[in-house]
Design a protein with these regions (language model features):
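Flexible "arm" and connector segments at domain edges
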Residues: 1-104
Length: 104
């Protein structure tokens, strides 16, 4: 319940436009981490980050994005009505189908 209390605190004390700014910042940081991961894996454009460091950054930035989405009321872990697990499963299945169709 502590997590939900923290989410509620943010909702009550941070204006929506500021939360949107926070989301944009976190998305940008996630994008940078993804670019670093790609560069480290490809190896043709060196980066000081190792692939493992970039992967860890992707995990961290993804969590930051999810936290902001929870604060916005778009996604929720504690509220079944806002938990998007079923929708995510359907979208993953569609993605798998598209990949399978391309390989066929």
């Amino acid at each position: 319940m502590a997590y939900q209390n923290d989410v509620n605190f943010i909702r009550e004390h941070v204006q929506e436009l500021d939360v949107i700014d926070q989301l944009l910042e976190e998305i940008a940081e996630l994008q940078i981490a993804c670019c670093k991961r790609k560069r480290s894996l490809k190896g043709t454009n060196p980066t000081p980050w190792t692939a493992d460091e970039a992967q860890q950054s992707i995990k961290e930035e993804s969590q930051d994005v999810l936290n902001v989405l929870c604060a916005m009321g778009v996604f929720g872990f504690d509220d079944p009505e806002k938990n998007s697990t079923e929708r995510m499963k359907r979208k993953m299945a569609r993605w798998v189908n598209r990949v399978k169709m391309k390989k066929a």
